């Protein structure tokens, strides 16, 4: 049995949760998120809590899915109340990022051309400087995916450390080959 699935989620007062079959709809001050829960998971609303369990009590996979569903719904509640963000930093001579419009990023990353990145719906970018941005949104998975996509354009290389990296990422710089 999943230890995570056994813990109920306390629903905050400013969040409303609607259960329609296996669909969970979470509404909060920052927006609304929907997620379809696996068929082997039973979700119940008891007082001001959400309780997750397996439909088949002896099924190990059902309890594993219940733990996953509980974590996903908990992330949805956190997203619509507080939100998620990832901070990215650029290291390198001439590496710049600028916000063209509310949905476009222009990146100069040492290539012969400027890279344009169109932001998906629900993602917002805030520029701290030309070398630092913050990716914000209510969907944890989407914020992480956009940050990973931006980082993939120029990953930090191990010899000089140039590239895009997360703010908390530590890049170990290798020593150059000696003759």
Swiss-Prot record:
Keyword rRNA-binding: yes
One Gene Ontology molecular-function label: rRNA binding
Record's keyword terms, sorted: Ribonucleoprotein, Ribosomal protein, RNA-binding, rRNA-binding
One BP term from GO: cytoplasmic translation
Keyword Coiled coil: no
Biological role stated in the UniProt entry: This protein binds to the 23S rRNA, and is important in its secondary structure. It is located near the subunit interface in the base of the L7/L12 stalk, and near the tRNA binding site of the peptidyltransferase center.
Protein name: Large ribosomal subunit protein uL6
Species the sequence originates in: Buchnera aphidicola subsp. Baizongia pistaciae (strain Bp)
